[in-house]
Every structure is written in structure tokens, then in C-alpha cells.
Amino acid sequence: MKKKWCLIVACLMMLCCAGQSLAATRAELAAINVSRTGNFKYWTAKAPSQQALVNYVKQITDKKSKDFIPVKDRVAVFDVDGTLMCETGPTYFDQLMYRHRIFNDTSWKPSSKLLEDTQRLLHADKYGLNAVDSDLLFGDCRAKAFDGMSQADFEQYVRDFMQEPVSGLSNLKRSEAFYLPMVEVISYLKANDFNVYLVSGCDRTTLRVLADGIFPLRPGQIIGTDTNYVASHQNGENGMSYMYRPDDTLVRGQFLITNVKMNKVSAIAKEIGQQPVMAFGNSSGDYSMFKYTQAHNPHKTAVFVLLCDDLDREFGNPAKAASVAKSAADNGWVAVSMKKDFKTIYGDNVKKVH
């Protein structure tokens, strides 16, 4: 999805204006516990998408059902931005942290080339960059912005930025900006013996820090955009010849791949090694993952796609929501209306700021 990079920069400059967070804390998010039978509390009564979810899970966990799926084959994959957490404040966490690094972090100085490339991202239309060009350039810029930073220092950088407030939504930190109803979905699937994986376009290490303590997932269950890690004394030497030293640490290196669209399918095949039976997402960047889940699958499948149709509690996009809803209808996916199906999104204390 094409981003309004200028809006991102403007909103970053406003971060200091928000107040104390009163949303569900990370501890409260982590404590969400839905039973095998589905005692949901953050969904509206008789929400069609929630009922479709429960009906599917009941069918495939019933040993007497023709649609029964053995535990070993119960694999569910989730996109993250716009599916599990906020992507409209004003955009992805990943991109906002990069902008913070470039424009607000006084502890370092970006190169003139990196600043030039950032301007190209800010004015993609002017420079003739399409969505693919922008994604690739952003991946390279992000890698350069954190090049040489140790794994531990980078993880702490993410934790620190997580404490920033979400632009445009009151009482909400970025660390808390998860959709309560969707946190329930993961809890529900785990209670029904699903193996859950996050398959995101977000930087993998960033996402591991964001998800840590919220979802009961191991680091290996989190798949994202990749940047290479190298030894601190490697100095460009090929990994086939360099020997890790006792005084080495792992530091961030070059951009490898953006985990969106068909790349998500490749990552699932490579890292999970099983075809999912359930998939959750919110945009065309997830459609390949959806279709891979459905194609030639020996098991009954279910695909759920969130519609960004809530203009009162979130920064919805009616045109995008309509397009995604049509794709859902055309492909047999279950559309989840954030406006109609979510009783709350972040908690009742979080309000949209105009």
C-alpha cells in the first residue's frame, strides 16, 4: 500500500504532544485468555466473522467430523500491520521508527546519500517510484540506518521507540497498539492446538520485540523482512571464510528481502515447511499468502481479511475497504468489519483525535 511519506514525517514531529497511555497495557494484552469453546469479549454479539471463525474451528477439531484436521497440520499464519496492530498512526511501526532515526535521533548523523534516498521516499511520485521500488528502497535505507548496530542495542532501540504515543489516537502507546479482538483470535487458536506464525512485512527483529510478551510465540514463529547479521569484526569478509571470534558480537548488516506478497509464500514454505490451513491479513500484500493457503490443500481452509472501515475509532479507508471486501467475496474469504464486528479496538479509553 502506497504511503503518504510526508504525512508520516509531520506526524512524527507531533509525537511529543500526546498524553499518558490509558489503553490495555502489555500485561493486560498478554493476559487475554480465550477458552477452547470461544468465550470472546471484544467482539460484537453475533458478529458474522467471529461466528465463521468458531464454526470452522469446531468443525476441524471434531474427531467425528469429515473436516477434522490433526493437530500437526493446524497451522495458522497472520499478517501483523493492519491485521493485529495499528498501521494508521499514520503508518507502519517499522517506517515510523526509520523516520525517527533519520529526523529525530541526535545520537548519529545519516549520510548525505541516505538523506537523498529518504527524500526520494518522501516524494515517490516526483521521482517516479512505484510501490515495489519504494518497498525495495525503504528496505535498503532502513538497513543502512541501523548498519553496524548490535542485536542487543537494536532490540533496545525498538523497545524505546515503542514507548512513543500513537499519532491521532489518545491514550495509546505504540507498544499497546494491538487490536484486542485479534489478540483474542490468537489465544483462541492456541487453545485449540494451532501452531500460529506471524508472517509480516515488518523487520523480523523489530517484530520479535513488539510481539514478545504479547503472544505466546517462540522467536522462530515470527517471520518478517530480513536484514543480514554479521560479526562485528567481519569487515566485509565472506561468511564462508570468516571464523566467528570470541570477542565478536552480532551486528546488523545489509538488507536481504522484503517479506510481502509472493515472498510471504516463499518464506512460509522455507521456514514453516507446511501449508497453512488458516490465514489472516488485511491487504493485497497478503493475497498470495491467502491463495497459497487455499490452493490444492488437502484440508478444509479458512481465510479472514480485515476491512479498514472504521472511521470513528480508527483511520479507516472506505475505498480500500470496499476493494478488499470485493476481493473477499470473489475468493471465498471471510471479511472482518472492524466497524461492525469489533466491540472495541484498543479499549474504550482510546479515542480518535481530530
Language-model region placement:
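C-terminal cap/substrate-recognition subdomain and adjoining C-terminal extension
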Residues: 24-44, 58, 66, 73, ...
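Electropositive phosphate-/nucleotide-binding environments in soluble metabolic enzymes
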Residues: 47, 148, 262
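N-terminal secretory signal peptides that target proteins for export/translocation
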Residues: 1-2
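Short, solvent-exposed loop/turn elements at domain surfaces
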Residues: 63, 85-87, 231-232
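A metal-dependent, Asp-based hydrolase signature
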Residues: 89-92, 96-176, 180
